[in-house]
Curated annotation (Swiss-Prot):
Name of the protein described by the UniProt record: Aspartate--tRNA(Asp/Asn) ligase
Family annotation (NCBIfam families): aspS_bact, PRK00476.1
Task of the protein: Aspartyl-tRNA synthetase with relaxed tRNA specificity since it is able to aspartylate not only its cognate tRNA(Asp) but also tRNA(Asn). Reaction proceeds in two steps: L-aspartate is first activated by ATP to form Asp-AMP and then transferred to the acceptor end of tRNA(Asp/Asn).
Catalysis performed (reactions): tRNA(Asx) + L-aspartate + ATP = L-aspartyl-tRNA(Asx) + AMP + diphosphate
Stated family: Belongs to the class-II aminoacyl-tRNA synthetase family. Type 1 subfamily.
Keyword tags: Aminoacyl-tRNA synthetase, ATP-binding, Cytoplasm, Ligase, Nucleotide-binding, Protein biosynthesis
Gene Ontology MF term list: aspartate-tRNA ligase activity; aspartate-tRNA(Asn) ligase activity; ATP binding; nucleic acid binding
Domain of life: Bacteria
Main location: cytoplasm
Length: 592
C-alpha cells in the first residue's frame, strides 16, 4: 500500500463518499471561514478541497493554519459530498471534499518569490531562477504537457508511415551550417575539439547511403545563436527525417498529412486548420508578401508596380527606377476616409523601419484619386495601379521604392502593420504554405556563398552549375511556414560527388578542403549513394504555435534566457584551473 496516497487529486467523486482516503500534494490555496479552514490540495493531476474543523480538532486546525502555501502535505480523512450551493464545477472533484483527520507535513515551503497561480505574469528572470515553482502553474505546466503529447503523436505518425527511429551522435565534428558551433574540448586528444551538432545533417545522409530507407528522430540541435521570439539560444528539438529514392513531391506528400493531422488534433475547438499547403516560390513570396515567411492569415498582397512608374511624372520614383530600384504597392482596404494622421503614422513607421519614406494614393468613394503623389500620375497610371493592387473605391495604396531587397523588407513590414491595425488577420486559423525554389547561391561583398543548405541539389545539377549565372541557379530547397513562422526547412540532397565538388569550388572550397571537412560524406558517396531528401519540422516552434505562446521559451521546460544564461543552474559557469589544465586549455578572455 502506498503510504502517501490512495488516490490522486482529480480522482474523487460522489462514488467515494464515506470512504477514508489518503492524499498528498501541495497547499494551493487556503480560506479561513471562521472555524472552518478550506484548503485546496493540488498535485499533478488536479485539485481536491480539504476541510479542517476547529471545533472538532482545534490542534489540527491550528497546525494547518500555520502551514505556508506550496508546502507538501499528506492527509487522511473521510470523503463528504458538498452541498449543492458549494459545488465547484470548474474542477473534477468539485462535488466532494475531504474532512481531514490526520495531517503530516512532508516538506514545508519557505516564503514564496512568486505567486504560483499567476507566475507567468512575473518578470522572466524571477520565473527562470525559480523554474521549479513556475512549472507548478497550470498555464506553464499545460504547455509542457502539450509538448509531450505533440512529440508522442509525431513519433506515432512517423512509425505508421514506416520510418525507423535512429539516434545519431551528439559529439561530432564541426560543419558549416550557417551558425556558430558549441565546441567541446577533448581530454584525450589535446588541442582538438568535438562540436555539438547543429543538426544531424550528415549523419542522416550517411544513413541513406547505409541502406536505410526512411529515418526519423526527435533530434536535439545546438546552435550558438542570438535569441528571438521564435528562436531559443543554445538548443532546440526537431522532427528530423530523411527518405531514400524520393523527389521533392514525395517529401511533400509524406509530411503534409502528418502536420495537418497534428495541428487538427491539438489546435483546440476555437482554432481552424487550413488543409491546404499552397506552394509559393521564393521570388513570388518576396514580391507578394515581402518575406520568405509569409503569414497567409493576412489577406493583403503586395504588387510590383515598377513599370508603371518608369516613365511617370513622379520624379522621385522615376529616378529610382532608372537607377535600378523597384516600386512595391501595398493595398489598404477601406481607408480612403481615414484622417491624415493615419497616413502620416504609416510614413513615420516606415522611417522607423529604415525606409526613406512612404508614398500613398487614396481612391475616394466616387473613384477620384487623391493623395500627395496622385497629382503626378496620369489617369491611365492611376487606373493601372488600381488594377495591379486589386483595390477599388474607398481603398488606398501605399508605395515603397528602394532596392529590391530593401523594398521587399519594408513593404512586408507595412503589410504586416496594416493587417494588424485594420483587423484583417484571421487569428482563429492556422495556415500553412511551402516556400520553394530558393536561390542556390547568394553574393555578399562580392563573394559567392551558399544561400541556405550547402548539401542540397541544384535544379539542373551539373548542367546548371556549368552553364547558368550562379545567382540564377535554383535549389531543391523548401520551407514550411505556418502563420508567418518558419516551422521546417528541407531539401533534396546532392548525392553526386562531382556536383558537390563543383558547387563547393564555386564558393572557394577546393577538393582537398571538401575532403577534409566532409570526409565521411565524400567517402560514402564513392560507394553508391541513392537520391535522397528530407526536412526537419521544429518541435519548439510547432508547440509555441499550438499553445499560442508569446515566445518559444514558454514551451521549453528549462530554457535559457534571452542572453543564453541558465539562471536556475548558473550556466555558463567558470571551471577550475585544474580542469582547464587537464584539457590543455589556456584562457585568453577578450575584455569588452
Amino acid at each position: 500500500m502506498n503510504i502517501y496516497r490512495t488516490h490522486v487529486c482529480n480522482e474523487l467523486g460522489v462514488a467515494h463518499v464515506g470512504n477514508e482516503v489518503a492524499l498528498s500534494g501541495w497547499v494551493y490555496r487556503k480560506r479561513d471561514h471562521g472555524g472552518l479552514l478550506f484548503v485546496d490540495l493540488r498535485d499533478f493531476y488536479g485539485i481536491t478541497q480539504l476541510i479542517f474543523n476547529e471545533s472538532e480538532n482545534p490542534e489540527l486546525f491550528n497546525r494547518m493554519a500555520t502551514i505556508g502555501l506550496e508546502s507538501v502535505i499528506t492527509v487522511r480523512g473521510i470523503v463528504a459530498e458538498r452541498s449543492e450551493d458549494n459545488v465547484n464545477a470548474s474542477i473534477e472533484t468539485g462535488h466532494v471534499e475531504v474532512k481531514v483527520s490526520t495531517l503530516t507535513v512532508v516538506s514545508e515551503a519557505a516564503p514564496l518569490p512568486l505567486h504560483v497561480p499567476t507566475s507567468f505574469s512575473y518578470p522572466e528572470d524571477i520565473r527562470l531562477q525559480h523554474r521549479f515553482l513556475d512549472l507548478r502553474c497550470d498555464k506553464v505546466k499545460n504547455s509542457i504537457l502539450l509538448r509531450s503529447m505533440v512529440v508522442s503523436e509525431l513519433r506515432r505518425a512517423m512509425e505508421a508511415l514506416g520510418f525507423i527511429e535512429v539516434h545519431t551522435p551528439i559529439l561530432t565534428s564541426s560543419s558549416p551550417e550557417g551558425a556558430r558551433d558549441y565546441i567541446v574540448p577533448s581530454r584525450t586528444h589535446a588541442g582538438k575539439f568535438y562540436a555539438l551538432p547543429q543538426a544531424p545533417q550528415i549523419f542522416k545522409q550517411l544513413l541513406m547511403v547505409g541502406g536505410f530507407d526512411k529515418y526519423f528522430q526527435i533530434a536535439p540541435c545546438f546552435r550558438d545563436e542570438d535569441s528571438r521570439a521564435d528562436r531559443s539560444p543554445g538548443e532546440f528539438y526537431q522532427l528530423d527525417m530523411e527518405m531514400s529514392f524520393v523527389t521533392q513531391e514525395d517529401v511533400f506528400a509524406a509530411i503534409e498529412p502528418v502536420l495537418y493531422g497534428l495541428f487538427a488534433k491539438f489546435a483546440g475547438a476555437d482554432k481552424k486548420v487550413d488543409r491546404q499547403f499552397p506552394r509559393i516560390t521564393y521570388r513570388d513570396s518576396m514580391i507578394r508578401y515581402g518575406s520568405d515567411k509569409p503569414d497567409l492569415r493576412n489577406p493583403l498582397v503586395i504588387s510590383d508596380v515598377t513599370e508603371i512608374f518608369r516613365n511617370s511624372g513622379f520624379r522621385t520614383f522615376q529616378a529610382g527606377v532608372e537607377a535600378g530600384e523597384v516600386v512595391r504597392a501595398i493595398p489598404a482596404p477601406n481607408t480612403s476616409g481615414k484622417p491624415r494622421s493615419f497616413f502620416d503614422d504609416k510614413i513615420e513607421r516606415a522611417k522607423e523601419f529604415g525606409a526613406r519614406g512612404l508614398g500613398y494614393v487614396t481612391y475616394e468613394a466616387d473613384g477620384t484619386a487623391k493623395g500627395p503623389i496622385a497629382k503626378f500620375l496620369s489617369e491611365d497610371e492611376l487606373a493601372r495601379i488600381r488594377s495591379a493592387a486589386g483595390v477599388g473605391n474607398g481603398d488606398s495604396v501605399f508605395f515603397m521604392s528602394d532596392t529590391a531587397d530593401k523594398a521587399a523588407d519594408f513593404a512586408g513590414k507595412i503589410r504586416e502593420l496594416l493587417g494588424l491595425e485594420l483587423g484583417l488577420i484571421e487569428h482563429d486559423t492556422f495556415k500553412f504554405c511551402w516556400i520553394v525554389d530558393f536561390p542556390y547561391f547568394k553574393c555578399e561583398d562580392g563573394e559567392l556563398d551558399f544561400c541556405h543548405n550547402p548539401f542540397s541539389m541544384p535544379q539542373g545539377e551539373m548542367e546548371a552549375l556549368e552553364q547558368q549565372n550562379p545567382l540564377d541557379i535554383i535549389a531543391y530547397q523548401y520551407d514550411i511556414v505556418c502563420n508567418g513562422i518558419e516551422i521546417s526547412s528541407g531539401a533534396i540532397r546532392n548525392h553526386r560527388l562531382d556536383v558537390m565538388y563543383k558547387a563547393f569550388s564555386m564558393v572557394g572550397y577546393d577538393e582537398q578542403t571538401v575532403n577534409s571537412k566532409f570526409g565521411a560524406l565524400v567517402r560514402a558517396f564513392k560507394f553508391g549513394a541513392p537520391p535522397h531528401g528530407g526536412l526537419a519540422p521544429g518541435i519548439d516552434r510547432i508547440v509555441m504555435l499550438l499553445a499560442d505562446a508569446p515566445n518559444i521559451r514558454e514551451v521549453i521546460c528549462f530554457p535559457l534566457n534571452q542572453t543564453g544564461e541558465d539562471l536556475l543552474m548558473g550556466a555558463p559557469s567558470e571551471v577550475s584551473p585544474a580542469h582547464l589544465q587537464e584539457l590543455s586549455i589556456a584562457l585568453n578572455i577578450k575584455r569588452k
